[in-house]
Structures are given as C-alpha cells and as structure tokens.
Regions:
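Class I S-adenosyl-L-methionine-dependent methyltransferase catalytic core
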Residues: 1-190
Length: 190
C-alpha cells in the first residue's frame, strides 16, 4: 500500500515514486509543493543558476527531488530515520543524479556542526516538534544560510513567526503553511 510522490516540474517532471504507507513522514502535498515552487521560481530563485540547497527533516525526499529536477547544483538531504533515508537514496539512484547527498543525522546536531553555507534551506519538521519555533534562530545563529539566502519553514497553521526579525512572508495552502525568512530583510519588507 503506497502514497504517490510526484515530481512537479523540471527534468524529472511527472516521475512518480511509491512511498510506503508505513512511513511516518508524508510527502508535502502536490498542491502545496507546486504553489511553493511557483513562489520560489517567480520571486526568489532561478534554480539553474548554481543554487545550493539544504533539505532538513527531508522525510521522503519530495522537496529534494524537486530541487534536483529544477536544476539545483547541490542538495543535501538531512533525515534521521534510516528507512526514510534509504528511500531518498533509492529515488536518487533511480533518477541517476549525483546532485543530491542524503545524510543520516539529527537535524539540530547537523545545524550546529555544518560548515557549509547554502542559498536555500527548506525545513519540514514534524508539526508537533516541541522545538519547531527555534528552527529559524538556530539556522541564523549557525551561519549556514548565505547572507542573501532564503529559509522556508513548513508548519501547521497554529505556528506564527511574524515577530521573528528575519521573517518576510507566510503562504498557506490548505493545512500546509510556509514561512519565509532572510538573513537580511530589505527595509520595504520589514
């Protein structure tokens, strides 16, 4: 018994992958993912322009494969569940890419130890994660987001980040919410 994970756009457009229903992680819905990437492509990135990305709490790798499909230069997928990580690795082998690097790690430890910087960081923690509110602060304090980079945090509607000094916008698609953050917020967006 499976859940279908689809690639929305790019070189792997329309590719489908069967995610076992036994997985705790669920792929971001097609509706939310398509809208998120429309916003990213129209307002923030040309993913084919050497973009490096970090996918935290990567789950099924739905965002990672979408980033690779759209032309990201390098994607690191961080996931602590060994089954989920094996699934991400299998998907990347199936599409024969060398652009994605799945890493088994606890996300907060990874953030502390990582010395690389990224143009784009996506985090999709479990909505009930007790430290969810601390994620933007941890990322900005660690220095892993480039100065002109973008952080997108997926969360439930009960979480609000508007008071965060790095917050720039929030998008909601059904029950899925995305908050956007930048290291340096332009004066027009404050």
């Amino acid at each position: 018994n499976f859940i279908i994970m689809r690639v929305i756009s790019g070189i792997y457009k329309r590719r489908r992958f069967d995610v076992p229903r036994s997985f705790k992680a669920r792929p971001t819905t097609d509706f939310a993912k398509e809208n998120l990437f429309n916003v990213l492509s129209n307002n923030y990135f040309d993913f084919e322009d050497g973009v490096t990305a970090l996918d935290l709490f990567a789950g099924t790798g739905s965002i990672s494969i979408e980033l690779v499909s759209r032309g990201c230069d390098r994607v690191i997928s961080v996931e602590k569940d060994p089954q989920h990580l094996a699934f991400i690795s299998q998907v990347m082998r199936e599409v024969k890419t060398d652009k994605c690097f799945p890493i088994r790690a606890e996300v907060f430890r990874f953030i502390e130890k990582c010395s690389e910087q990224f143009d784009f960081i996506f985090a999709d923690p479990p909505y009930a994660l007790k430290d969810l509110k601390s994620i933007p602060t941890r990322i900005f304090e660690s220095g892993i987001l480039k100065e002109d980079g973008l952080l997108v945090l997926e969360h439930g509607k009960e979480n609000h980040f508007e008071e965060d000094p790095h917050f720039i916008e929030r998008r909601a698609y059904g029950s899925v919410n995305f908050s956007f953050f930048r290291a340096t917020v332009p004066a027009t967006e404050q």
